[in-house]
């Protein structure tokens, strides 16, 4: 039994879905799936390296390469044969809203809901982050995953005596006081 196809992440649907030659009498167009369109957009239009583009789409680099090669072949056939290009279909999910709290550094994705406050600490100091602009760390500019990979802290630590307590979800560590010395706590892992 073959493995199920993994959904590809696209950052938005194209504004135009059909490209047609001016004097085209050809009725059958070349269909390019939206995941193939996204591969072309990331690699050829934005000039993002294949490894990073594959991470953005949530697929492996070999799968990204196959998708890109397929799209380029279809576009070449349409140009040479004078056929229309139709963008539609494919196995994809949209990733329009990626959020990051600037106070507690918590990151989350929500394609349906628009957030005004951080679900972890309640801060209104949040930014919508594009997957293309997320900085990578480590040798060569690429790391494993987003940012430093820590996410929100799981432990609150006293800055004076070193006392540690489990973090309460939705309550920023900086609002907690150390039960031993009364000093403010901070997030730590």
UniProtKB/Swiss-Prot annotation:
Domain of life: Archaea
InterPro entries tied to this protein: RNA_pol_sigma_r3/r4-like, UPF0251, WH-like_DNA-bd_sf
Disulfide cross-links: none
Protein family: Belongs to the UPF0251 family.
Matching HAMAP family: UPF0251 (MF_00674)
Name the record gives this protein: UPF0251 protein MTH_1178
